[in-house]
Regions:
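Short amphipathic alpha-helical segments and helix-helix/interface helices
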Residues: 50, 77-78, 100
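A short, acidic, amphipathic alpha-helical segment used as a generic capping/interface helix at domain edges
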Residues: 45-55
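Generic secondary-structure microfeatures
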Residues: 26-32, 57, 65-67
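Mid-chain, well-packed structural core segment of small domains
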Residues: 58-91
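Non-catalytic interface/targeting segments
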Residues: 1-46, 102-118
Length: 118
């Protein structure tokens, strides 16, 4: 696992991680940034949209729902996470990136998906 990842800033449509600017939605899996994250149903995150995260078996999943918070997790995903003992934290991206940083630097097994726009 990478131990030095740091989300430095977020503004609508842009996230800076370790000095690199990302302008499309991203996932962070075991400390590795996966850029160009697209979901099958746009603002709805379902199990198929995060298979790579689920395979990494995180204890916590942080979802950044965008600036106004339009992105949501599906009921099927919420049930799956609960049944598999994975804590889900859904927040507007402006708060979620800070939550991720705090948990990651505490040594938690945390992964994330961030919607960078609406």
């Amino acid at each position: 696992m990478i131990t030095h990842i740091m989300i430095e800033q977020y503004s609508f449509g842009n996230m800076v991680i370790n000095g690199v600017s990302y302008r499309n939605d991203i996932k962070i899996i075991q400390g590795k940034v996966v850029s160009e994250w697209w979901r099958k149903r746009g603002h709805l995150v379902d199990i198929d949209d995060i298979q790579d995260i689920l395979k990494s078996k995180p204890n916590i999943l942080v979802l950044g729902k965008g600036s106004p918070g339009q992105m949501k997790s599906s009921e099927a995903l919420r049930k799956f996470l609960k049944n598999n003992g994975i804590e889900l934290i859904e927040e507007k991206t402006s708060h979620a990136f800070k939550t991720f940083n705090r948990l990651f630097h505490k040594g938690e097994n945390v992964s994330a998906g961030f919607h960078l726009s609406c």
